């Protein structure tokens, strides 16, 4: 119905994506908002599987965990998560790298700067 009106549709779901991946693609929405690479149980998403399912169908906003990685992570953990997200979700387009769900006041600003620096190094993907 949304597409019949010439509009795009987004869906927000930060965790629990993997078991529903095929269903989410079937829904036919255009943008997946707040894809968190870390589940509540601490397990990491298989971002390559997400990309394979979403490629050419669903754009992703997210890829960078805020509470564990940006707030508490080391420089290397932040850099690695940015690199993982861009390399897995970026090729072919469709990624807006974004902290899920926002940058909190408690987040050290240096962590944000590290994420931006890391993104600048890996943003030119094929």
Which residue ranges define each predicted feature?
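Active-site loop segments of alpha/beta catalytic cores
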Residues: 1-126
């Amino acid at each position: 119905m949304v597409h019949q009106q010439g509009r795009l549709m987004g869906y927000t779901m930060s965790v629990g994506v993997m078991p529903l991946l095929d269903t989410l693609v079937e829904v036919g929405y255009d943008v997946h908002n707040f894809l968190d690479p870390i589940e509540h149980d601490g397990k990491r998403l298989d971002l390559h599987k997400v990309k394979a399912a979403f490629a050419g169908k669903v754009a992703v906003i997210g890829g960078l965990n805020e509470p564990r990685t940006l707030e508490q992570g080391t420089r290397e953990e932040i850099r690695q998560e940015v690199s993982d997200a861009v390399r897995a979700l970026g090729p072919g387009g469709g990624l807006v790298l974004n902290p899920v769900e926002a940058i909190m006041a408690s987040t050290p600003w240096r962590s944000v700067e590290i994420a931006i620096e890391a993104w600048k190094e890996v943003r030119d993907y094929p």
